[in-house]
Amino acid sequence: MSGKGAPELSVRNCGDLRVAVIAAQWHEKVMDGLVDGALRALHELGIDEPTLLRVPGSFELPVVAKVLAGRGYDAIVALGVVIRGGTPHFEYVSQGVTLGLTQVTVDTGVPVGFGVLTCDTEEQALDRAGLEGSNEDKGHEAVTAAVATAATLRTVSEPWR
């Protein structure tokens, strides 16, 4: 299972961060779990007014993330699902989304939490969606990673003493 060995991140003093969550609409049940996990994580971190935007699919996540990164957000979380089918479409979309979101982070300095599931089957996606009986909660994990990185960036941006 991919969740083994995940770090336990301690994130404090982040309630004033501006965070946006962008969620694709394909695979509604999986997406509902990812969004719920993301919003729960934000609430636990004291971030009670995040921006939540929906896009048609995972391929649209990078362009919206790039625009939001230029609008003063401290962290962005991208949530989506790409499930392998019988054509090369899976590889193209997975690679495009991954590279696109990475490029947004590198170009803008705004962390983008990667909550895009790339799975062989819908069952694998459901098992990672944070639903009752799921083994993992990737929406929650993506928020924690993005906010922890934003908090680190805030620390290194402060003047050295």
Curated annotation (Swiss-Prot):
Gene3D superfamilies assigned: Lumazine/riboflavin synthase
InterPro entries to which the protein is assigned, alphabetical: LS, LS/RS, LS/RS_sf
Protein EC: 2.5.1.78
Catalytic-site annotation from UniProt: H89
UniProt entry keywords in alphabetical sequence: Riboflavin biosynthesis, Transferase
Keyword NADP belongs to the record: no
Binding positions for (2S)-2-hydroxy-3-oxobutyl phosphate per the UniProt entry: G86, T87, R128
Gene Ontology terms, MF aspect: 6,7-dimethyl-8-ribityllumazine synthase activity
A GO cellular component annotation in the UniProt record: riboflavin synthase complex
Catalytic reaction equation(s): (2S)-2-hydroxy-3-oxobutyl phosphate + 5-amino-6-(D-ribitylamino)uracil = 6,7-dimethyl-8-(1-D-ribityl)lumazine + phosphate + 2 H2O + H(+)
Pathway assigned in UniProt: Cofactor biosynthesis; riboflavin biosynthesis; riboflavin from 2-hydroxy-3-oxobutyl phosphate and 5-amino-6-(D-ribitylamino)uracil: step 1/2
Residues reported in the UniProt entry to bind 5-amino-6-(D-ribitylamino)uracil: W26, S58, F59, E60, V81, V82, I83, F114
Gene Ontology BP term (one): riboflavin biosynthetic process
Tree of life domain: Bacteria
HAMAP family: Lumazine_synth
Role of this protein: Catalyzes the formation of 6,7-dimethyl-8-ribityllumazine by condensation of 5-amino-6-(D-ribitylamino)uracil with 3,4-dihydroxy-2-butanone 4-phosphate. This is the penultimate step in the biosynthesis of riboflavin.
Family, per entry: Belongs to the DMRL synthase family.
Protein name: 6,7-dimethyl-8-ribityllumazine synthase
